[in-house]
Amino acid sequence: MSKLTLSHPESDHKLILDEETGLIREIVFSSNSISRAANVTTSIKLQIDGSERRAPTGGLEYFGTTEIIESKSTSAPEQAVTNDGIEWRMRANIGGVSAEYRYGLNRKGPGCTASIIFFGNQNVLVRNFSLSMSVQLPKDSWNVQIPGNGLRNFVPVQNITSGVGVSPIGGLRGSSGLILATSDSHGCVAIWPDNFIEIPLVEFKGNGADNFTVAIDSNFGSDLNAIKSVELPIFSADLSVRNWDEFPEIFDGWLRAKSITSPNNPPAWINGSMIYEAQIGFSVFNEKFKYSPYPEVSDLIADLDRVKSMGFNCIQLMPRQPYPSYNIHDYWDIDTSYGPKEMMIDLVKQCHSRGIKIILDILLHGVLDKEIIKRAADGVRNGPYAHLVSADTADSFAADVNDWDNYLIAWSRHILDFEKYWYEGSPEISSLVAEHPDWFYRDSANNVQGVYTKAFDASNRDWQNYFIDACRFLMTELDIDGFRFDAPSYNDFPNWSVWSRGRAGASALGCLGLFERLRPVMKSIKSDSLLYTEPSGHAFRQSMDLNYNYDEQWLVTAICDPNARSPWGISNAKDLAGWFESRNLMLPRGSITAHHIDSHDTFWWPSWGKKWRREQFTMPQVKLLTLVFATLPGPFMMFSGGEIGIESLLPKISSTKQLFLNGEDGISWWTQDWIPDDVFVQSRTIEGKNIIVAANFSNKIQNINDLRMGKIASVLVEAGEHCQYSEGKLSLPALSGVILSVERN
């Protein structure tokens, strides 16, 4: 096997390629007396041609495709100078498809990058491109860090014996998508699937103590006859960092190099806020159970004083249930979408008079009509989950990020539960389809497609104008304080319309450009308005003031149910604190996360009788979860009804959150050896005192024998049994927690 070496004086990295295939064989770093190398076995798979059809659970699936795994280089690498550094371009033939591998050595950001160009004027439909890398590391004990995903800190690579999903940078349930292998003697090896044009599926697997595999399934698609060329970023890599402690600051530079930054100027009111998610109307489960906390808007108005008394200072109002629910009827029809317009105006006034902000849940993914509802429901009845719709479902967020079975069973049941309500309220065919045919996802036969709505293409500029106008209308008409943008990347499937088929997978993240345009419009109407969205991935933090905590939700089940723990997930409360610390270190600066344990999402998908955390776990555990998640940096959110059993705890938590706004030194996570494994501890310095949050998740007394902070000044909050305190020592009863103010020595 002949090798080619790509190196340049501007870089301390070099890449060694297989001359025959053009694929990477080795990544090398050399600087001063330090030299590191990782041998790489790279394989690819190109899926082409065939046909598409609606999948049983919506979107599209392919059939009759051809899979190609052979790559043959057809030219020597040609060097070019780019804005980012030095790049080599190497032509390749992939089973008859003309392409070009591009490898870069960068002046800023990660040391090296890899991408592929597909050339146009070929009678080829690219359906997907996948790459797998088996990385052989120097002999050592290697651990892996994948911050913001379903692993605890520093898991031995050899322990990860099956594939673990890694939510990518544009993903729903993760953060950066970064994979970092660390060792004491050989530094760090970073692999970063950094494409945020598509939403790839990424998987990590250990192959022993010093070898791992990263598989990247790009979700890329292109009609090569429709374009001249198209470039697919695959991954970046770096071997220069000595240890984990140095990495967060370096990674912040990588993010800035890719313009992945937070606006870092959120409305001042959001920092210590408590958000109450309110539902008007009723939702239906298993055809016979209904949940209706507020049948009408007037019922919510009548309850505002109680909501305020629990410490909530923001209402997040869901779309009216069961119709239109989380679907689009008509943005300008306030009566149908949320409630009677005059009553909505009164609700906003009543909230504002009490010092409560109010935001609306607003939808992007698609419009309802009878045609698509019937198609979705028939797909469920004839699909792979039809026989399971009555089966028990658990917390969907406890599973691996690439395991959707539990969710899809619950989703299938949800479609059938809501079918008649959606059907009755919808037009036969939405007029928007005829009026604006280019606003919608389509298959190659030009049929409008979707999951259970007719899917909007959020990358379409004219549709973006329509949505921005709708937001402007709702803000000015109702005087609301912002929006929570529900499921902006929900249409995560290819759009093969005439105008988008050059890059069929790009529509799923078309919302990113929309949000960039929308932000200044909203801020011009209300400078302290809130932009808040559901996905946790870094790409969604670029234009948002606030993001959901989908990346955290697996932690709730893992800390409360030992049977739900994986060999690589958190195993105790100290792991929980460590997970938060590493995740937060890797967020774009200024990012804010809204934390919850009960939301309408966590409520909707489990079976009846196991919907609330208080039904899944014990009340003492729920109190501890509230103590922990509500005192994390950022707002705390709760779905209406989640407060049952913790009504007296919530206002105390709210007061503490207001106190945290005066913090001096940020947050400290107590993960030292002298902290018991089953105790979660974090602290802040406020006005010369340390405010300590401690929670014992075990069934026995736990002692912290060295508070290192002096004597206790006051007890702010207790959850569970009374705790015992003396100078420098804290004794926590089983399943109990406390917030203490401690004098600093």
PLM region spans:
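Aromatic/acidic polysaccharide-binding cleft in carbohydrate-active enzymes
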Residues: 489-492, 546, 591-653
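Beta-strand-rich recognition/accessory modules
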Residues: 7-9, 93, 131-132, 171-263
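Acidic, contiguous internal or C-terminal segments within carbohydrate-active enzymes
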Residues: 86-142
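Acidic-aromatic substrate-binding/catalytic surfaces of carbohydrate-active enzymes
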Residues: 2-91
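Substrate-binding cleft/loops of secretory-pathway carbohydrate-active enzymes
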Residues: 368, 374-378, 524, 532-569, ...
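Substrate-binding/active-site clefts of carbohydrate-active enzymes
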Residues: 263-269, 273, 279-295, 306, ...
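Glycan-recognition and catalytic regions of carbohydrate-active enzymes
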Residues: 86, 540-543, 581-582, 608, ...
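C-terminal beta-strand-rich structural cap/linker in extracellular carbohydrate-active enzymes
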Residues: 726-745
